[in-house]
Amino acid sequence: LAKTVPLNDGTNFPIFGG
């Protein structure tokens, strides 16, 4: 399942797993 994690610069980083 893909999720997006908000980074400090305001962008979203996609992660896979969990």
Swiss-Prot record:
Domain of life according to the entry: Eukaryota
Coiled-coil ranges (or none): none
Class of this enzyme: oxidoreductase
Bilayer-spanning residue ranges: none
EC number: 1.1.1.149
Molecular functions per Gene Ontology: 17-alpha,20-alpha-dihydroxypregn-4-en-3-one dehydrogenase [NAD(P)+] activity
Catalytic activity as recorded in UniProt: (17R,20S)-17,20-dihydroxypregn-4-en-3-one + NADP(+) = 17alpha-hydroxyprogesterone + NADPH + H(+); (17R,20S)-17,20-dihydroxypregn-4-en-3-one + NAD(+) = 17alpha-hydroxyprogesterone + NADH + H(+)
Signal peptide region: none
Keywords annotated in UniProt: NADP, Oxidoreductase
Record text on subunit structure and interactions: Homodimer.
Described function: Specific for the oxidation of the 20-alpha hydroxy group of 17-alpha-hydroxyprogesterone and 17-alpha-hydroxypregnenolone.
Protein name, as recorded: 20-alpha-hydroxysteroid dehydrogenase
